[in-house]
Amino acid sequence: MVITLKDGSKKEYAEAKSVIDIAYDISEGLARAACAGEVDGEVVDLRTVVDKDCEVNILTAKDEKGLAALRHTASHVLAEAVQKLYPDAKVAIGPSIDTGFYYDFECQPFSREALDEIEKEMKKIIKKGAKIERFTKTREEAIAFFKEKNEPYKVELIEDLPEGEEISFYSQGDWVDLCAGPHLMSTKGVKAFKLLSSSGAYWRGSEKNQMLTRVYGTAYGSKDELKEHLEQLEEAKKRDHNKLGREMKLFTTVDVIGQGLPLIMPNGVIIMQELQRWIEDEETKRGYVRTKTPLMAKSDLYKISGHWDHYKDGMFVLGDEETDKEVFALRPMTCPFQYYVYKAEQHSYRDLPLRYGETSTLFRNEDSGEMHGLTRVRQFTISEGHLIVRPDQMVKEFKDCIALAQYCLQVLGVEEDVTYHLSKWDPEDKEKYIGEPEVWNETEEHIRNMLQELNIPFVEDVGEAAFYGPKVDINAKNVYGKEDTMITIQWDALLAEQFDMYYIDENGEKKRPCIIHRTSVGCYERTLAWLIEKY
């Protein structure tokens, strides 16, 4: 077989080789630094055996995907250390994230002193340098394995997998975890790490579930890189809007009011009102008409839209379907309300496009572990809009929405600070989405072509679409490097049918419109946080 390397050079082998063997064949230094591999563009474990012609790239901690594998291994070392120090602790999940890693445990909260003790135990595990090995079990064997260990969260995760699925595990010495990988070859590869904080997080992000203890950490390929990151972290804390915003008397929070429910102080209100007036005036210039719709609705509305099936866990529900005649929910978005504004009258093809704008107060039941200052809250204000258009108008109107977003970013002086994302559906997760594959593929292609025509660099994110359509997400990083979505523009070819929306065409026949969901600067609270950290 012929292996093509990243630099274009080739290596020939008479028999199958593991990725780590190929790394050693290139150079011993590269093999020692290797964290994972790429085979034909797919990230794989170093233990993966290659048995046919392909392209192979060896990933180190200098590569984003290699660093993710290192951090994932660090999360396993963390979990082993916690269970050694706290034998009754139950393990949940422990992924790598953009800024490091975390692991969730069912156990007592950890103080800074406790985290320091866990760090010491992690260093012992790393020094021991246990070999990390991958193995598989059948679904039934995996469930039995974790039931015997009394690990209910792992059992639940496995039970959600399809029948007949082969389940992968990783062991480091005697400690074993359920995991898809990839991981380093040995715990000794985790050379530079730091546990940062501990907080609460509900299992699977739902307040109906057990509150777990989440431990955050970070890891790098060298101690110098870690030191530099920790120094940057200290500087970031000084610029954190959560600190500056309080010092500037822009907002505050109160425990008895609740997490994710900030009080905007008079100084903060002045800024948000200026933003609101500016956005509303700009939307009016661009042909938007204003609506004012209720803050709540019966569950029936969300059942029509599909939010009840696909988003209920993220909503605040008032009442019990089993005991109450009517159940209400605080609105997580404005779209279904504005559809009924449209349906209140009959519309001709000449009336379209119709552009509805509203400064909306919305409510979303966010995971407590994810909430921070003004960037992720449970009640927020947003410049929301929905455009009802004919299919032949869709591309032009979508481009105009992008232009409005870019204008707003330019005025705020932050257009250079954002990245564009084409958020697509995941064809492997059909329960998460409505509609047929051909509709998804067509609408995603329209957005891809538009972004290319507008010369906007973008990345494609599988599985990040709304349940009813793909979208453009315009994201920005906070002072800690975490990316938040600031502006969203969504292509919706499906909900008009759900709500039986139509217009009368030139032949007097009923036709389905298309819908664009969009924001101008997005959530005012998050925008305020962004501006505080920027300026």
Where are the regions a protein language model picked out?
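A translation/RNA-centric and nucleic-acid-associated enzymatic feature enriched
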Residues: 326, 336-337, 341-345, 354, ...
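Ubiquitin-like/PB1-type beta-grasp interaction modules and other compact soluble beta-rich domains
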Residues: 1-75, 79-97, 117-124
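Auxiliary tRNA-acceptor-end handling modules of aminoacyl-tRNA synthetases
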Residues: 51-69, 90-94, 102-361, 365-371, ...
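Glycine- and acidic
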Residues: 6, 256-268, 323-325, 339-347, ...
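Structured ligand/cofactor/substrate-binding pocket environments in proteins
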Residues: 268-277, 347-360, 380-386, 393-402, ...
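Active-site palm subdomain of RNA-directed nucleic acid polymerases
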Residues: 88-90, 405-419, 531-535
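Metal-assisted phosphate- and nucleotidyl-transfer catalytic regions
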Residues: 128-173, 410-489
